[in-house]
A protein has these predicted regions:
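Flexible, glycine-rich beta-alpha linker
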Residues: 110-111, 118-119, 145-164, 174
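Substrate-positioning beta->alpha
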Residues: 157-165, 182-202, 250, 254
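N-terminal Rossmann NAD(P)H-binding glycine-rich loop of SDR-like oxidoreductase domains
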Residues: 3-22
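Mid/C-terminal beta-alpha module of Rossmann-like enzyme folds, strongest
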Residues: 199-298
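Conserved Rossmann-fold NAD(P)-dependent oxidoreductase catalytic core, especially the SDR/UDP-sugar
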Residues: 86-128, 135-138, 143
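Conserved beta-loop-beta element that borders a ligand/cofactor-binding pocket
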Residues: 129-154, 174-183, 233
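NAD(P)H-binding glycine-rich loop region in Rossmannoid oxidoreductase-like domains
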Residues: 47-84, 91-93, 108-115
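A conserved pocket-lining segment of Rossmann-fold NAD(P)-dependent short-chain dehydrogenase/reductase
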Residues: 148, 165-188, 200, 208, ...
Length: 416
C-alpha cells in the first residue's frame, strides 16, 4: 500500500506522516497495515507538479491535508483550499486512479451560526462539494472530515491555535491574553485525530451528519433512527473524530499554569487516562525551551548522605530518592498510619523492622542487583543500613502521603 499525504509539513501532516512511517518501519504494529505499507509520499508547498503527478499515478489512498488558513487576501482562501483540491482530483482522474480520498475540512464549512460569513468556511465548503461530486463521478470513496480546533505537539504558536499559543507563551514566561474566560471550545487532540486517520485507512472511519454545527453520529444500518428530528444533510456522508473535549478558555489556562508550577511544587496534577488534562500536559511539555527541560531538585544533604523529594501527587503521596554513605544507618523510627516502599536500586543494604512492643526483628537483605520493594509497615520501627564499605546505597522511597511538618507521624525508636 502506498499513501499520499498532501500538506505533509503542516501540523496534522507531520504527525500523520510520523505515525505512518512508524507503521511502515515496524515501530508501531497495526494489524493489517504493518508489513503492507510500502511507501508514504509526502507532498507539500515545496514539492513540484511532477511530484504530484508521480504520486497520484500509483498511490492507494490520499490524505489531502493541504490548505490555506492565514492568507494575505480573502481570495487566497478559495485558491488555496478549492484550487488545490481541484488539481489533486484532476491528477487522480488523469491516471484513472479511483483510490479513497480523505479531505480535511473545518467546522466553519457548516456556515452556521458565527461561521455564517466565514470566507474560510466558504472555501472549505466548496472543497467538500467538489469532493462529493468527484465521488459520484468516479465511484471513488471520499471521506470528508470537518475538524474542530486542534491541539498537540508540533502545532505552530501565535498562528491558528489558541492552545499552542498559550502553551508556548506560558512555557516561555510570556504574557497571554484571554478576553473571556467563559468561552467554550471544542478541541481535538492530534493523537486522537491520527488514530481516526489510521482507522479510515483501514475502512473503519466514523460517519456522521450535521445538525447546524453539531455532529450527529450515523450508525450503519440504522441511520433513520439515529438522526430523527435533525435538520439539514442527514445522509451520513461526512466523517468525524469521535473523541473531542469541550472546555473553557479559563480552564485551559488554569491547567497550563498549574503545569508550569510543577518544577517548583513537584506536584503532578490529576491526569486520568484519555483525559483532556493528560493530553494538554503532554502538549505543554512539547513547548518547553531548552533551559526548562531540566530543573534542579532540593537535596537535603548531611554527613550521612542525602534525601531528595522527586514527585508529589494530590492523592497518592510522594516519591523520593535516598542516598546513604558506606556504613551508614538511617531511619530508626515508626509511623501510625504512614507507610512506605523502600526500593534499593544501587548498592548492598539491610532493611530491619520490628513491631513496637515486640522483640522480633524482620531482616531484609537488599541489593541493586536484585531489585525488590519492601513495605515499611505501620506500627513497625524500621531502618536501612548500608552494608558496603565503599559504595553508596541508593534507595527509591515511596510514601503514601506527602510529608506534613505539622503532622509528621514519625516517632524515633531504634530497631535494636
Amino acid at each position: 500500500m502506498k499513501i499520499l499525504v498532501t500538506g505533509a509539513k503542516g501540523f496534522v501532516g507531520k504527525n500523520l506522516c510520523a505515525q505512518l512511517n512508524n507503521i511502515k518501519e515496524g515501530k508501531c504494529v497495526i494489524p493489517g497495515l504493518t508489513g503492507n505499507l510500502e511507501a508514504v509520499y509526502e507532498y507539500d508547498i515545496d514539492s513540484t507538479v511532477e511530484d504530484l503527478d508521480r504520486y497520484c499515478s500509483d498511490c492507494d489512498f490520499v490524505f489531502n491535508l493541504a490548505g490555506v488558513n492565514r492568507p494575505q487576501t480573502p481570495e487566497e482562501f478559495m485558491q488555496g483550499n478549492f484550487g488545490f483540491a481541484s488539481l489533486l482530483l484532476d491528477t487522480l482522474k488523469k491516471h484513472g486512479n479511483t483510490c479513497p480520498v480523505m479531505i480535511s475540512s473545518s467546522i466553519q464549512a457548516t456556515l452556521a451560526g458565527r461561521f455564517g460569513n466565514s470566507e474560510y468556511g466558504r472555501s472549505k465548503k466548496a472543497g467538500e462539494e467538489l469532493m462529493f461530486e468527484y465521488g459520484k463521478e468516479t465511484g471513488a470513496k471520499v471521506l470528508v472530515y470537518r475538524f474542530p480546533n486542534l491541539f498537540g505537539k508540533w502545532c505552530r504558536p501565535n498562528y491558528n491555535s489558541a492552545v499552542a499559543t498559550f502553551c508556548h507563551n506560558i512555557a516561555n514566561d510570556l504574557p497571554i491574553q484571554v478576553n473571556d474566560r467563559s468561552v467554550e471550545m471544542e478541541l481535538l487532540y492530534i493523537d486522537d485525530l491520527v488514530d481516526e486517520m489510521i482507522a479510515a485507512l483501514q475502512g473503519n472511519e466514523h460517519r456522521c451528519a450535521y445538525d447546524g454545527i453539531d455532529v450527529v453520529p450515523v450508525i450503519a444500518g440504522s441511520t433513520s433512527s439515529v438522526i430523527a428530528g435533525s435538520t439539514g444533510d442527514l445522509t451520513g456522508r461526512y466523517c468525524y473524530c469521535p473523541v473531542t473535549h469541550k472546555i473553557t478558555l479559563g480552564e485551559i489556562v488554569d491547567l497550563i499554569y498549574s503545569f508550569a508550577e510543577q518544577p517548583k511544587t513537584l506536584m503532578i496534577p490529576e491526569i486520568p487516562e484519555n483525559s483532556f488534562a493528560k493530553k494538554l500536559y503532554s502538549t505543554y511539555l512539547s513547548y518547553l525551551p531548552k533551559e526548562k527541560v531540566s530543573f534542579p531538585l532540593k537535596m537535603n544533604v548531611d554527613a550521612r548522605g542525602s534525601f531528595t523529594e522527586l514527585v508529589h501527587t494530590l492523592n497518592c503521596g510522594q516519591v523520593s530518592i535516598n542516598i546513604s554513605k558506606p556504613g551508614i544507618t538511617k531511619g530508626q523510627h515508626w509511623h501510625n498510619t504512614k507507610w512506605e516502599f523502600f526500593i534499593v536500586v544501587s548498592g548492598h543494604g539491610l532493611i530491619q523492622q520490628r513491631r513496637v512492643g515486640s522483640d522480633e526483628i524482620l531482616n531484609f537483605e537488599v541489593s541493586g542487583d536484585k531489585i525488590e520493594a519492601v513495605h515499611m509497615l505501620p506500627g513497625y520501627t524500621h531502618n536501612i543500613i548500608n552494608l558496603s564499605d565503599t559504595e553508596n546505597l541508593v534507595t527509591v522511597m515511596y510514601c503514601n502521603e506527602i510529608f506534613n511538618p505539622q503532622k509528621p507521624d514519625t516517632y524515633f525508636e531504634p530497631v535494636e
